[in-house]
């Protein structure tokens, strides 16, 4: 019985790490959704919540990384367990960056709150934000569920989000030429599109880390 105890303790610590990973993943998903919703309907209280959540995600990831490193040092895990712990560190870093990007989106949305945004660029951005939210959700659940098929789908999704970015860029630029006085605020649409593209890139990176965790092979 004594020989089994360290293994039982290890499994408990591993389970706790997974729980922490699930919590920060859910908070990141909700924070990103809250940020992109500000594009359609700005709300100062929600914007402040995004900023607050971004800081909370940073703290949560720091604690997760500390637990993961401590687990590696104390238990010296091997094979699949080691790859999972290392993946938690890597994915946590991506989630932290996504939290920062959500805050950037919220701050850019604030600059647009009193402006008359042309319909087509706004529709493009809404479509892009919905698609990126789907990518982020897919990347996170692929990791948590260790779903290879879902992780591999993200590669195709990345091409789609690049197309959506190009489309948004085209329509925003056209609107700028039609009304040069709008340039000062429409540039924020381009910033938001770029932030969304980066979130999409992070979702793909999470999927790639999932594939490596499962197969120990480069995606």
Curated annotation (Swiss-Prot):
Residues in the signal sequence: none
Which UniProt keywords are given for this protein, alphabetically ordered?
A: Cytoplasm, Phosphate transport, Transport
Gene Ontology cellular component list = cytoplasm
The family database entries (InterPro entries) matched by this protein are listed as: P_transport_PhoU (IPR028366), PhoU-like_sf (IPR038078), PhoU_dom (IPR026022)
Which Pfam family, just one, is annotated for this protein? PhoU
Coarsely, its chief localization is: cytoplasm
A GO molecular function annotation here is:
protein homodimerization activity
Q: So which domain of life are we looking at?
A: Archaea
Q: Does the keyword Transport apply?
A: yes
Q: Please, one GO biological process term?
A: phosphate ion transport
Q: Where in the cell is it found?
A: Cytoplasm
Provide the assembly information: Homodimer.
Q: State the similarity comment.
A: Belongs to the PhoU family.
Instruction: Give the function comment from the record.
Output: Plays a role in the regulation of phosphate uptake.
Protein name as annotated: Phosphate-specific transport system accessory protein PhoU homolog 1
Q: Which organism is it from?
A: Methanothermobacter thermautotrophicus (strain ATCC 29096 / DSM 1053 / JCM 10044 / NBRC 100330 / Delta H) (Methanobacterium thermoautotrophicum)
